[in-house]
Design a protein with these regions (language model features):
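Conserved Rossmann-fold NAD(P)-dependent oxidoreductase catalytic core, especially the SDR/UDP-sugar
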Residues: 6, 26-28, 34-36, 76-143, ...
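Glycine/proline-rich active-site loop of Rossmann-fold NAD(P)-dependent oxidoreductases
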Residues: 120, 160-165, 188-197
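N-terminal Rossmann NAD(P)H-binding glycine-rich loop of SDR-like oxidoreductase domains
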Residues: 1-25
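NAD(P)H-binding glycine-rich loop region in Rossmannoid oxidoreductase-like domains
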Residues: 29-95, 99-102, 190-193
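Substrate-positioning beta->alpha
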Residues: 93, 133, 172-187, 197
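Short-chain dehydrogenase/reductase
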Residues: 198-206
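Non-catalytic, hydrophobic alpha-helical segments
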Residues: 70, 151, 181-185, 201
Length: 217
């Protein structure tokens, strides 16, 4: 399986790239900074240097062509202003969806955010803008003719993954290791039955395979 991952140098993406490469898949990470290429190669991924904030659908389509799936795991990151929440967390996610649609790549997995729809549209606070950007991106992806899955994790931590989560359409506030989010992304890619589903996920007690299976019963 060839999987193109936007935000290829993010911590979730690097976990996912290692997991995919370990089982013989071909992860292709899109990065903005050429200095990050070596890190992706060390993780077993191919790297493509492309700035999604300043790219066209045609340019992204060149990277996506021939992929079995795309994953959006990019983000403006801590310390960025409101403007980049819109250009990265919203616009780049939509750009990847348009490129996937243009090239016939139907499988789109989106890393969104817990509580993305519960934001204050009148608030200038950066976090509220971030949630609004994620919500808008999710809505745009749902509106496209793609086999999408939208994953909304809680607060992200760098602790080792436990392989156990609480996963549902809506869950209470909580945190989750980035490694577990990557495991969910990997497993979702193997489950066409999760297409058309949006869910929240935090740390919990249910093994990830069982939690994902509960979505489709």
């Amino acid at each position: 399986m060839r999987v193109v991952i936007a935000g290829g140098h993010g911590q979730i993406a690097l976990h996912l790239e290692r997991m995919l490469a370990a089982r013989g898949d071909i992860p292709v990470g899109i990065v903005r900074n050429a200095a990050h290429v070596a890190d992706l190669e060390q993780a077993g991924a191919n790297a493509v240097v492309l700035d999604l904030e300043h790219s066209s659908v045609a340019q992204v389509a060149e990277v996506v062509t021939g992929a079995d799936a795309v994953v959006f795991s990019a983000g403006a990151g801590p310390g960025s202003g409101a403007a980049r929440k819109l250009t990265v967390d919203r616009d780049a996610a939509i750009l990847l969806a348009d490129a996937a649609a243009a090239t016939g790549v139907r499988r789109y997995v989106m890393v969104s955010a817990y509580g993305a729809d519960n934001y204050d549209p009148n608030s200038p606070e950066v976090y509220q803008v971030y949630l609004g950007a994620k919500s808008d991106a999710d809505a745009a992806i749902r509106a496209r003719d793609l086999d999408w899955t939208i994953v909304r994790p809680g607060g992200l931590t760098n602790t080792p993954g436990t392989g156990r989560v609480k996963l549902a359409d809506s869950v209470g506030r909580g945190s989750i290791p980035r490694e577990d989010v990557a495991t969910i992304l990997r497993d979702v890619l193997d489950l066409p039955s999760t297409a058309g589903r949006q869910f929240e996920v935090v740390g919990g007690t249910t093994p990830i395979p069982d939690a994902l299976a509960s979505l489709v019963v």
